[in-house]
Amino acid sequence: MEMKEKIRQKFAERFGGDGPMYVAPGRINLIGEHTDYNGGFVFPGAIDKVIMVEIRPNGTERVNVVSLDMDGEDSFGLTEEERPKTHWAMYIYGICREIIKRGGNVGGFDAVFAGNVPTGAGMSSSAALESCFATAINDLFNNNEIEKFELAWPAATPRTIIAAQTAALWTSLYRSLAARTT
């Protein structure tokens, strides 16, 4: 079964019904890793590995997320300072918090995601995850009124929240490749 079908099946099983799907590519830096935040040059490119998410507003102030790759589930609130329990959900939490902080709208949602971007291999699986969710939230809760360039900043911030490391802007700029899919 393909990734998309697995996501659709789990979403229907866990939350009932369906929602729109979004996809974002992983990336490589053709001239080496870690050069961006060390003041060096970058030459990034998208790859054929992706993160895909099915997501739907749930009419609450809670975010409920299932990760097929991590075999896990997490939930957190939007109105209180309740952090997720899992490391991977911190990226989604960071996106939500930063969009709200910058004046955007975020409501509760249910989501299931999976991907084939290798984790820990320098192909930006976390950036692809952030990109998917930032694009989906912009579409579902802000009518795509947040410009792609502006959306790059909220997508960069979760790295600061999680790893106390400033994300480089170029890593975030490739997020403009994220899109709604059918």
Where are these regions (language model features)?
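ATP-binding N-lobe of GHMP and related small-molecule kinases
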Residues: 2-127, 131-148, 154-157, 162, ...
